[in-house]
Amino acid sequence: MLAILGSPHKKGATGKMLQYAVDVAAKEGWQVDIVYLYEKNLAYCKGCNICLQTAKCVMQDDIVELTRLMSACDMVVLASPVYWANVPAVVKNLFDRFRGTAMAETKTFPKPRFSPNQRFFLLTACNTPAPFSFLMGQSVGAKKSMKEFFKTGGMKYAGCCVWTGMNKKEIPSRVRRKIKKALS
């Protein structure tokens, strides 16, 4: 399992959810690799489009390691906070840098390059309480962005947990149950 944290706060809401997912996965026997995006050296995508022909980014930074990890895993768990109804720039940049790795462009629809045997599970947290987080599109926008990337790449959707109104210090029990179910 590849666990990716798209937040600068390891002990924040998304960090807590990801750590819980990692703990559950380890107990279930998964081999887990953890990536903290804010600690990685990932230059911004230059839009050169070479990756569409080569299936890999030409810039040689930490994307090389991330490409290897993403290609080798059975499951990706991406934890990202909601920033202005979307994912933070570091997560969006990861998607941009993986463009040619995740898909090949054709005359009609993108052709997935990830294995259809791979699955993805999403974790996100939003300060806006429910139901306003959903009605106002806050967490919906972030979830849509993450889901679109992985589905376009060909991975199977394994679910999503949204922690809204995260003024609570502990992960809500419904979120814990959903994480456990997805990884068991």
Regions found by a protein language model. Name each.
Residues 58-147:
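Helix-loop-strand module that forms the ligand-binding subsite of alpha/beta enzymes
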Residues 37-56, 168-172:
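N-terminal beta-loop-helix "entrance" segment that forms/cooperates
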Residues 30-41, 160-164:
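A short beta-strand-loop structural module common to alpha/beta enzyme folds
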Residues 22, 26, 31, 118-120, ...:
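Residues at the starts of beta-strands that form the adenosine-phosphate
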